[in-house]
Amino acid sequence: MNARPVFPVELLERDRWIRRSVDKVPLQVSGRNASSTASQTWSSYAAASSSSVGTGLGFVLNGDGIVCVDLDHCLGESSVVADWAREIVGQIPGTFVEVSPSGDGLHIWGRSSFQGGRRFTVDGGGVEIYSTARYLTMTGRKFEGSTDVLADLDEFVEWLLELAL
């Protein structure tokens, strides 16, 4: 039996929810294409979560201080953290962290003054940081030790960006 998705109130209160296709195409609750830069294509959580369009949910980042760090392919069997990601996961402050739809990645959500997007590798592993004009798939499947709040990630993001140098 699947656990009910859990999302921080700070995300639930924002009308920036969309649906997504199996291929991660952003969709409106009507089934038409959504856009990460066109707010009229976004919905409330209630509307998006009750829609049967597509295969899941997404949340749009619009530069208002919400940031997501995406660690690609960092989880192995039984959610064992890959060597390349172990130090990163150990540095995560008490914030909302969810397992990605693939089951082998993590989305680290929080607040930050970071603007834009950045993609880089750390010891061969993929790291992405986004705060605007982007949507991320959402599962609500909390990773071990995750909280239900969005913490300040400024220091964490700064530390990650130093790893990218």
For the regions a language model picked out, list residue spans one by one.
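Conserved phosphate/metal-binding and DNA-contacting active-site motifs used
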Residues: 1-165
